[in-house]
Amino acid sequence: MRRPSIYGLSPVALAVLALATLPPDALAQSRPYQPESVSASEYARAEQFLPWHAEKLTSGVTVSPRWVDANRFWYRNQVFGGHEFIMIDAAARTRRPAFDHDRLAAALSEASDESHEATDLPFDEFEFNASGGIRFWTDIDERWDCDIGAYRCTGPDSVARATHEIDSPDGSLAVFSRDENLWVRDTGTDEERQLSTDGEPHWGYGVAPEGCCQEISNRRTEFKPPPVAEWSPDGRRIATHRYDERDVEDLHLLEAATGRPILHSYRYALPGDSIVPTWQLHLFDAETGARVRADYDPVVGYFGGADTTWHAAQWSPASDRVWFSHHSRDFKSQTLVEVDATTGASRRVIVESGDTWVELNQLRTPYNWRVLDNGTEFIWFSEREGWGHLYLHDLATGEMKNRITQGSWLVVQLLAVDEVARQVYFTGVGRESGRDPYRHHLYRASLDGGGVTLLSPEDAHHAVSASPDGRYFVDTYSTRSTAPVTVVRDGSGRPVMTVEEGDISPLLEAGWEPPVRFSAKARDGVTDVYGYLWLPPNMEEGAVYPVIDYVYPGPQIGPIRTPGFTSGPRGQGHALAQLGFITFAIDAMGTPYRSKAFHESYYGNMRDNGIPDHIAALKALALRYPIDIERVGIFGHSGGGFSSTDAILTFPDFFKVAVSGAGNHDQRGYHFPWGEKYHGLLERNPDGTDSFDSQANQNIASNLKGKLLLHYGSLDDNVHPNMTLLVADALIEANKTFDMLVFPNRNHGYAREPYLIRRTWDYFIEHLMGAEPPVDYRIVQP
């Protein structure tokens, strides 16, 4: 087994680091790495490091716990050659297979008359049924029930997977939304009961909003998301919203089809619209259907994507009160509201306002507030002092009682509260001196203030989740160069058992190299910014290499996502390095996990995109690494499509090639909360201009000097194709040569399609490296 050398750097990386000792003129005299062609075999070598191949060379690197009760959870474990299901009992300190995989494969093979292997069972998740057996749906949506005592399987049947339901606390009922109304189903008898009757189109109960980000995708696949709802602890009541999109204007998409195309329309509000979605809290009695409407005016809607989890609501232990939070349209205030579940009487508990956006988590959700079970206090996340921290407040008055945490570091996620011991558990970044400031750690602090205790001492990135009762913490820790280790910790931080020790030896033996971690100064010459470089193997002495910048500007997340181990990071860093590129990714100013000032650095100026920090860092790195600063390319998807096009148009003498996908090139055409939160409310001027003109890529299309490939999916119901077409039209008007690729009938999620990956490689090989790519190389995704 080949292991990374000291400091997490490979031998190749250490050799390159030696170049840092060379004087700047030595690098300046280097020759460009520019082969005449890149062969199909080199593409094949790069292909083996794409995520779907690289992950098969690892084992035990990911643990996503599915809790069965307060002590037990199961997870799907990827192993070499397949996968397995493992059951953990944290209280008993035991780890065992969730069932006998060989016997289950045999029973399923006999019942289905198809061959099944123990390490390749045809499901990724399961649930325990009332008799202690398991129920699962196969990848072709067949439902099976298997007795894991006698190992007999029955099925398949045509009962659809209930993705659209949320079970009550005891599992006896399930709530769902149908035809704009709220329903419950008795899970024992399947009897259904309608709770509301006055729902109407675009004004329904519990419905997933049509606006951003996949309404048309859901319709076409017949996927039904769960309702936006929260059961009371006693299972008697359901809190939900009535979501109003009645007068919101439509967007339209055309599905390519033989003969006439198919028109798809959906409600989608844009910045500056006079009417945007709103919602109002409603409470239903699950037995009688009696409804209580909160005595509180409708608030601005902001639910997006497939995740309809209601992060903004919490019930009291006695099920007599419910709290919810909401923001103003401009996001400059957050409000916590208390509602009496019997009468609907409502009151504002706290209103926090600011000059820019106010958040309850730098990553948007889940929200970092919690009302304590004692009914007299609540925890509130705030960046009021420049960093995101937790504060204890009086529930009756809303007044702050004390700081729970403080200092020049960030609370990331509130995980659990032990009210008896008066302790709160959370993850944070940037607190440990001498460590990578982006590595998450687990902490404990007193609700009454006075100190913070580190519970995860290993100098690594810790991905942590809590058990339902907060007694145990599942902690997977790793670095970019070391395999993950997963442990269960108790409230003292002590590891009570080891769950997994990841194995990445086959990946290393295949030639995989960890990226090089770097820090550099941002545009201001003062602020530290951090990123990674992926270096080509077997670099030639005296050569400088073209560099590709993988960009996602945030503000809600950056391009790197995690400083922990990942075999296939976003941006194809390892694969592109195999082709002879140095690949670069950086969390520039405007991305999260730092101070509020860092995060909001380009508020009101979304064209910034952090690109000046990319340029400053690349210029500095070119003095230390064999980077050809005259050959810089950039690519990205979604916000990265916007920012990569912005980069080549705003800095045309620095960025020579850009590949830009599904870009929100003008926030006036994107979901209203996005631009209004990060750029400000749209203001129209008497001369016909507005406050969003400055961020629109089509307005600077005439600046293009380099090579630009635009691409989009024609059924993108997240980032509408209209924005890319506006850029294309402006480029044509400016008589600029560019390339464009359309993915018919794809939604926003086509970035990992093999054809796009190959075309991206070809484009950079031809126009940035100056070489000839192999003709029509085919990348195969298993």
Stretch-by-stretch model annotation:
Residues 1-13:
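Bacterial N-terminal signal peptides that target proteins for export
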Residues 26-28, 745:
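Intrinsic low-complexity/disordered segments
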Residues 249-250, 310-314, 319, 325-327, ...:
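Serine-hydrolase catalytic core recognition
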Residues 16, 20, 28-484, 488-489, ...:
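Beta-propeller folds
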Residues 9-11, 196, 750:
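Compositionally biased, intrinsically disordered low-complexity segments enriched
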